[in-house]
Amino acid sequence: MSTGVKPFGFARGAHGLHATIVSICGPYARDKNIERMPSADLRPSAEPPHPNALIAIDHVTFGYDASRTILSDVSLTFQRGKVTSILGGSGCGKTTLLRLIGGVHAASKGCVRFDGEVVDTRNKEQLYRQRRRMGMLFQFGALFTDLSVFENVAFPLREQTDLSESMIRDIVLMKLNAVGLRGAAQLRISEVSGGMARRIALARAIALDPEVIMYDEPFAGLDLISMGVAANLIRTLNDVTGATSLVVSHDVPECMAISDHVILLAEQGRIVAQGTPDALMNSTDLEVRQFVRGEPDGPVKFHYPARSMAEDFGVRV
């Protein structure tokens, strides 16, 4: 039986709709000590700088336009089989990192390596081959609202493989069972809750058994029970499949509970700290403490930079 895999990129289908079923992920190794600076000084090379590194961000600079730099000279490595959370304020480049790993954007300077190969947006054949090994859970699910739960999960299997319908059926039901929704297979997307929709999107993201799963804000907009379910699924799927998981989130407690390694970013991708969850939670560094404890003022100021009160209100001192 042929299982020929088609290039994995922008999938076309489902009544003319387009879906990006790309996926990525990468975690960090467990370290006993918190690091205040980037953990690796990566230089261009044919192989990853660490024997177990699956993804390497190598002195990457990127901006969506010339007027604003999102990431500036960022270097990171992600090891196989771990859950790594990337935390930080809005606009610090967390989601942009995922897009660079998946080849959605190309770095202005530096490079991204996946399993030793440069992620080159110009080399479509190689990029599709790399993306075939990645899975992505989007923040808003990107589900087809006019299809059933079953057909949403089956979509990448139909688009990217030549599997028989009976095999597709079995795979879809197994993936839905893994996220606790096998019984919801025939429901329409309009009939499911937000938390269920997130789990359906996860089942679709793992339909092709990716080596890397990238989660973009997987806890956003979920109630406490759904949030706990999502966190448990991320950790369990990682442990059962041996995948590498990369979680971008603002939710500190959930990420600390499921991660092997945590990276805290600031403006332009500056690495504030990285280490085990315990190391960051017990850090005495003021910037780290402010973020993990949610303190309103500290190194990250409450007030946006402005002229003095005397200047704005015409008060003479």
PLM regions and their residue ranges:
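ABC ATPase NBD coupling module
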Residues: 119-135, 165, 280-283
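Catalytic Walker B motif of ABC-type/P-loop ATPase nucleotide-binding domains
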Residues: 213-216
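Conserved ABC ATPase signature
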Residues: 188-192, 196
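Conserved ABC ATPase "signature" region
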Residues: 118, 165-184
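Helix-to-loop junction immediately C-terminal to a conserved catalytic motif
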Residues: 102
